[in-house]
C-alpha cells in the first residue's frame, strides 16, 4: 500500500489561489521533495496531507486513511514539522521535546534517551535548558524538527525543515533524513533550497498551485534540457546544424564562435563519436564533455515552461470566449 495518495486533490481559496487537481502517489521508503516558487502552494499541499485542510475536491489518503479522520494508532505513526513555530515558548528546549514525546506514549527511560538523541542531532543539546521563546529563529526551527523526530515516526511531513539553518547543519540533517529512508521510513518535505531536490528520490514541482513536473531529479533535468547536454569546442568557427539527426543528436546550437551545445538522446553514446561527426562536417574537435544543468537552472526552465503553457491555455480560452461573444452579437 502506498503511504500517501492524492487523486485530483484541490484546495481552492478563490481568485486563483490554492492547489488544483494534484495527482501524487508516494511509495513507502521514499524521500519526496516538493519545490516551487514562493506562494506556489507547497505548504497547502502538506496541510492537505496532514488533514489540517479539507480538500475542496478530490481525494487524499494517508497510510490508508482519510487524514481528517486518522485513528490514534495511525496518527502516532506520523511526524509533522510545521512551517511556523508552534511549541511552547515558556518551556525549555528539553521540556518541549519531552512533552511531545510523552504525548506519543514514550515511557521515561526511552523518552529521555530519544530527547537527548534528537537534541544532539539538531545541535541543541547544549541549549536544552534555555526557554524556547529565547531561542533564535533558526534554533526554533531545529527544535521543531527534533520534536517531529522524537517518537520515530514511519511517515515524516516536514515543511521547510532546513529553512534558516546554516549549510553545515543542513548537511547533517540531510544525512539523518537519508538514514531514516534506509530504515524504510517515508519523508515528504518542502524546501526553499532548490539544490536540496538533488537529495530526494522524487521531486514534485508546483507552480501556480499546479503540479507541473514529477520525477527523479535526473528525469527532471532531462525534461528541462530536452535530453543529455554535451558542450563541444572546435579549433575554428563551425556550424553545428549539420550534426542534427546524426548519432542520436536531437539539436546542436552555437554558444560561441568555436563552441556549441548538443542535446542528445544519450551523452555516453554521442561523445565517443562526436570527433568523427565533426570531422565529417568539415570541422576539427578540440573537446567534448557532458554537462549537467544545476537544479536552479532546471527549476527556472520548468517553471518558465509551465507559465508559458498556462498563458497559452488562458489565451485560447479568452479567444474562444471573445469568438462566442461575437457570434452571439
Q: Predicted regions span which residues?
A:
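Conserved ABC ATPase signature
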Residues: 90, 131-138
